[in-house]
Amino acid sequence: GSTFPYNPYPFPWTSHLFQDSPSVAMGIFEGHMSKMAEGFKAVRQAELELAGTYRPEEHDKFFRYFNWQQFSDEEFLLCPPVVAVGGDGAMYDIGFQNLSRMLMSGRPIKVLVLDTQVYSNTGGQACTSGFLGQVSDMAPYGSEHHGKEEIRKEMSLLGMAHRTAYVLQGSISNVTHLIEGYIEGLNSHRPAVFNIYAVCQTEHGVADDAATLQSKMAVESRAYPLFRYDPDKGIT
């Protein structure tokens, strides 16, 4: 990022407390969609007027309360998505309640979770995304303790349990699966959770050029299985 008013990215972004990403995204989404709705409303009203089919008794009330929930598929795809980004500490732990609330709201906000399975930004402490037996800061191995003593929180399964969201669990080792999931999730009218295995070379103790290999081993060993879940595809 950068310091206001400078922006190094080709799109708008905001910085905030790292656990607040989903909550901030909800507010941005409402303002963003309100602005888009004004434009779509003007276009629809003009089309009705030109066709001579505008009926005040029907359309006045409709356009008074017109919002993103009435967008057509074409209109929805014209709206730049609102994307919240966070690591496992932000989304699995301290900000999980914010993420859960956002998913239950049904707002089509997209959340990218970079799952390193440790607190990479504060020194590699253990977190709930790590596996049982993991050795890391705050989860030592010795005569009394044998690494992390808690089982892993499965974010993707929790996302599915909300029954409102598109869920992708992916890895850079399988790029086709990853890109297809991103496209499906971004185009979905639902919230989306992209839970992505992210190698932290320093804390995982692997070489700088070994991220793809490490990701491949995580997938093939079934430690990090790949899947996509779309509630709109029906009962499976």
Range-by-range predicted roles:
Residues Y6, E180, E184-T236:
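Glycine/aspartate-rich loop-and-adjacent alpha/beta segment that forms the canonical ThDP
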Residues A84-G86, Y166-S171:
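Short catalytic-loop micro-motif centered on adjacent basic/acidic residues
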Residues G89-D93, S171-I179:
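Active-site glycine- and acidic-residue-rich loops that bind
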Residues T116-N121, Q201-E203:
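Short gly/pro/ser/thr-enriched loop/turn and capping motifs at secondary-structure boundaries
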